[in-house]
């Protein structure tokens, strides 16, 4: 049986078109995926992402444990109220998941993990944390609402009291505020390439909060728009652009691996070092096809001199009005590429992602 978000009835009332996502019945769109995409790029939209997992860690060895568990270094989170993006790797250097970690207390952290991997993630984290003085608790009662777009912060003004709004208005990217009981957490983070907030609240408060944002004119948006927004922003999708068989070094995620402390032997470090010693063989690039047509996942890409690659994420860009894609290709200087469509080779432009930043074309 499919799992439902606590906001399922709200989505049904709004005439959502549902889709199965990792065993969850979630809104794909509420009538027009394209309109929802433009709503976020131009104004503000709200997403229910409560299918994602929330995991709290607490204990005197929580920091030491996460420095071992994660490829990025939580020692960078020098203050409570800061967050970072990281990969969690297996010993072979493959990506078990990508996630955000929040420092909620001097000895406390919160992880937000992907829906498709949440059960696997909690099992892995508990297994690896067994030798550390740390408590690990999944928080299935928490919901996550993402309010995204250039007007997202302004939309929150009438939702929260004056003092709280002043705090969130002053938030820098990857910073957050939370209540003393942690039953309200507001972070300046997102997955759309726009400014915005991600709000974690108990299910008992989520419906009211959702309704108040909608009343302010923030339009509900589904997973379809979320995917086209993240693709335009050049953001990876787990299971598509990387998985347990691919390392961050070939997934445009080298920047999420912290090498600063030579003594920090995080899981997967030796495998990544070996890849570097042997020279990384692949990379992710951006492709743009301005001719009519769609670039699709798993489609082959032919390069002028360095063989062929494969599209990992492809689709139509509503902002640009044509097809874009992320593709994994051999390392090397590549100036031209083609894809096949209806038996013909079609030229595609190679760019460095993102394709869109703050609603504007980047190339």
Curated annotation (Swiss-Prot):
GO CC annotation, single: cytosol
Top EC category: transferase
GO BP annotations listed: glycine decarboxylation via glycine cleavage system
Keywords (A to Z) from UniProt: Aminotransferase, Transferase
Cited Gene3D superfamilies: Aminomethyltransferase beta-barrel domains, Aminomethyltransferase fragment, Probable tRNA modification gtpase trme, domain 1
The EC number(s) this enzyme carries: 2.1.2.10
InterPro entries: GCS_T, GCS_T_bac, GCST_C, GCV_T_N, GcvT/YgfZ/DmdA, GcvT/YgfZ_C, TrmE/GcvT_dom1
Catalytic reaction(s) noted: N(6)-[(R)-S(8)-aminomethyldihydrolipoyl]-L-lysyl-[protein] + (6S)-5,6,7,8-tetrahydrofolate = N(6)-[(R)-dihydrolipoyl]-L-lysyl-[protein] + (6R)-5,10-methylene-5,6,7,8-tetrahydrofolate + NH4(+)
UniProt KW Oxidoreductase keyword: no
Molecular function, one GO term: aminomethyltransferase activity
NCBIfam families from the UniProt entry: gcvT, PRK00389.1
Biological function: The glycine cleavage system catalyzes the degradation of glycine.
Oligomeric and partner information: The glycine cleavage system is composed of four proteins: P, T, L and H.
Family: Belongs to the GcvT family.
The name this protein goes by in its record: Aminomethyltransferase
Organism, as annotated: Coxiella burnetii (strain RSA 493 / Nine Mile phase I)
């Amino acid at each position: 049986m499919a799992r439902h978000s606590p906001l399922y009835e709200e989505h049904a009332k709004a005439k959502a078109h549902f889709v199965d996502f990792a065993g969850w019945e979630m809104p794909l769109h509420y009538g027009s995926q394209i309109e929802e995409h433009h709503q976020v790029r131009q104004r503000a939209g709200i997403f229910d992402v409560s299918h994602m997992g929330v995991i709290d860690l607490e204990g005197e060895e929580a920091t030491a444990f996460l420095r071992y568990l994660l490829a990025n270094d939580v020692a960078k989170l020098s203050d409570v109220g800061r967050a970072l993006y990281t990969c969690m790797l297996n010993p072979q250097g493959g990506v078990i998941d990508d996630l955000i970690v929040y420092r909620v207390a001097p000895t406390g952290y919160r992880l937000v993990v992907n829906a498709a991997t949440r059960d696997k993630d909690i099992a892995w984290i508990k297994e690896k944390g067994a030798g550390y003085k740390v408590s690990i608790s999944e928080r299935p009662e928490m919901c996550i609402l993402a309010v995204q777009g250039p007007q997202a912060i302004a939309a929150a003004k009438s939702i929260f009291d004056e003092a709280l709004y002043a705090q969130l208005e002053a938030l820098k990217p990857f910073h957050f505020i939370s209540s003393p009981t942690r039953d309200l957490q507001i972070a300046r983070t997102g997955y759309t390439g726009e400014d915005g907030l991600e709000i974690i609240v108990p299910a008992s408060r989520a419906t009211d909060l959702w309704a108040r944002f909608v009343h302010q004119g923030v339009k509900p948006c589904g997973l379809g728009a979320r995917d086209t927004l993240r693709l335009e922003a050049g953001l990876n999708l787990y299971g598509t652009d990387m998985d347990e068989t691919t390392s961050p070094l070939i997934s445009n995620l080298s920047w999420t691996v912290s090498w600063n402390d030579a003594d920090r032997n995080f899981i997967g470090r030796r495998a990544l070092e070996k890849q570097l010693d042997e020279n990384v063989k692949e990379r992710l690039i951006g492709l743009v096809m301005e001719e009519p047509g769609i670039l699709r996942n798993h489609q082959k890409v032919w390069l002028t001199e360095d063989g062929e690659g494969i599209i990992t994420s492809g689709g139509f860009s509503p902002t640009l009005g044509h097809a874009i894609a992320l593709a994994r290709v051999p390392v090397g200087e590549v100036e031209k590429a083609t894809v096949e469509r209806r038996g013909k080779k079609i030229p595609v432009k190679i760019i460095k992602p993102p394709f869109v930043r703050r609603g504007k074309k980047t190339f």
